[in-house]
Amino acid sequence: MKKVSSKLLAVISILVIAFAAIAFAGCTPKGSKTKIKVVEAALAEDPIAFGMAKTEAGKKTQEIVNAWIDKNKSTINDLFEEYAKMTDEQANAKNIEYKTEADPAKKDKQFVVATSADFPPYEYIASGTQKILGVDIEIAAKIAKELGKELVIQNMDFDAIIAATAKKDSLIDIAMAGLTENEERREHLYFTKVYKVDKQVMIVNANNKSFDGMTTDEINKKIKKLAEEKIGNYKLVIGAQKGTSSFGIAEDYAKDNKKIEASSYPNPSLAVQDMKNGRIDFVIVDALVAKVLMAKFNK
């Protein structure tokens, strides 16, 4: 009996150690080496434009910027191509001069831009610096130069931009933040001509095969199915940047299904990091932004 008991104890000890190892592994932070990929099918297509207050001054700015867009379509395309390939070293070498505070006494001498510098390649803070760069910032600098005005860049949370720009007494001339023009936003702002059409896509972990090769309709059905497969109180969690059209899509999924949750983030990078760490299932973002995030997280 003692001999049998000893064997049993030995087996139990091995099992305890094994389960402890598994439990410890489960507590190890996920995601540090997890790569990500983009599901290519578009969930939606977005017209990207600049916004300004519904005032006489806003109308004048709209006309000026529309004329600039018409004359500089090739320049805009070149900027998107440049920023798609830009390295940290190249970004750090750029020198766009701007101030960060608008001066009421210089209202007619400054070109004041509201942005949210967390949305590459449209606008972002260059790695290891405090410099705000991006396609929108380059365009702003070129317009300010043509107008003979000093460029002012006011960086703020994305979901504060529309209200800050729309205020009748605002010093902001224009919102340049990868803004999708839509009916709701047109209630608050004038919009320029569309300067870029982007699409909304999903980012998933690279080992996630759920949506491979699917059309948009197939993706929508698959999302519903995955949500239904969640057990108990668990939900399918979709991450996106707060206040964006990406988050609007996530909310639409959640509105139609109680097993889906839309989770908002200050910027897309944080959403992707949470996905890599297993806290959410996937992220919705603009396709151009997705490319930049792929380069960042798959280094």
Task: Report each predicted region and the residues it spans.
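C-terminal motif of bacterial Sec signal peptides marking the signal peptidase cleavage site
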Residues: 22-26
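Extended ligand-binding regions for polar small-molecule ligands
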Residues: 42-91, 137-141, 145-146, 205-221, ...
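Extracytoplasmic small-molecule ligand-binding "clamshell" domains
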Residues: 68-82, 86, 99-100, 104-179, ...
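Periplasmic-binding protein-like
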Residues: 31-62, 66, 90-94, 117, ...
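Bilobed "Venus flytrap"/periplasmic-binding protein-like clamshell domains
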Residues: 117-120, 129-145, 197-269, 287-291
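Acidic, polar ligand-binding/catalytic clefts
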Residues: 34-44, 141, 145, 150-226
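Hydrophobic residues within well-ordered alpha-helices
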Residues: 30, 50, 65, 143, ...
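A ligand-binding cleft/hinge motif common to bilobed small-molecule-binding domains
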Residues: 28-44, 160-163, 177-188, 248-253, ...
